[in-house]
């Protein structure tokens, strides 16, 4: 209650462990999904798929990402932010695993399964990063605080695809890059869980069950 009642500004937010857990969690989450998003077409063409299929997959990931945005936002209002975020990251990891099993163009079904599962997982990021931050640092200066938090997102977007490309150039394989993306997603979910927005503000669904 004391945390929730505090009037936060950038300086006071920067001095907290929760801020840096969210900063690191958001950076790792973005690093994970952008590493895959940027290289997915190259990955598929490297396995002899037509570039047009790669473009189709990009579109499907976007479509199912939109579905995921609605679903994860809805779910987080009922079970809690970090639980929904962890499930979303789990979907992302499952999608990466499915993609990693695609060895050649005979596995078209796996490519479409990847697009659905990864896309839905990818959709967790937009609604949950903002709502988690708002739960933790709600107040008159929230926009400024969230802007600084979002630097982590930008860093992940810049680092992930570049490192993935460098790893491919060094190993002539995406195995290590996909492992990195998987690990980053797990770290992201863990960091958000440790930031524990549930201990600052309970979501409506949890409050309703507690009083039901």
Where are these regions (language model features)?
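Extracytoplasmic gate region of multi-pass secondary transporters
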Residues: 11-72, 160
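Hydrophobic core of transmembrane alpha-helices in multi-pass small-molecule transporters
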Residues: 27, 110-124
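Interfacial helix-cap and linker-helix signal at transmembrane-aqueous boundaries
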Residues: 44-45, 75-76, 163-172
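Loop-to-transmembrane helix entry/capping segments in MFS-fold secondary transporters
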Residues: 51-52, 139-148
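C-terminal ends and interior cores of transmembrane alpha-helices
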Residues: 91-104
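Intracellular juxtamembrane helix-capping segments at the cytosolic ends
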Residues: 124-137
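Symmetry-related core transmembrane helices of the 12-TM Major Facilitator Superfamily/SLC fold
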Residues: 176-193
């Amino acid at each position: 209650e004391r945390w929730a009642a505090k009037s936060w500004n950038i300086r006071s937010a920067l001095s907290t462990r929760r801020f840096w857990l969210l900063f690191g969690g958001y950076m790792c989450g973005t690093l994970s999904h952008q590493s895959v998003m940027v290289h997915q077409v190259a990955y598929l063409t490297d396995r002899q798929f037509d570039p047009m299929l790669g473009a189709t997959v990009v579109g499907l990931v976007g479509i199912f990402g939109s579905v995921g945005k609605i679903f994860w936002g809805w779910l987080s209002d009922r079970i809690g932010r970090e639980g929904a975020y962890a499930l979303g990251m789990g979907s992302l990891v499952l999608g990466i695993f499915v993609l990693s099993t695609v060895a050649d163009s005979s596995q078209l079904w796996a490519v479409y399964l990847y697009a659905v599962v990864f896309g839905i997982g990818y959709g967790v990021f937009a609604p949950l990063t903002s709502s988690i931050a708002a739960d933790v640092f709600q107040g008159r200066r929230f926009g400024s605080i969230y802007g600084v938090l979002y630097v982590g997102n930008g860093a992940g977007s810049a680092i992930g695809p570049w490192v993935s490309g460098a790893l491919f150039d060094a190993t002539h394989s995406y195995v290590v890059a996909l492992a990195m993306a998987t690990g980053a997603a797990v770290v992201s979910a863990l960091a958000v869980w440790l930031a524990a927005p549930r201990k600052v503000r309970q979501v409506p669904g949890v409050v309703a069950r507690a009083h039901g």
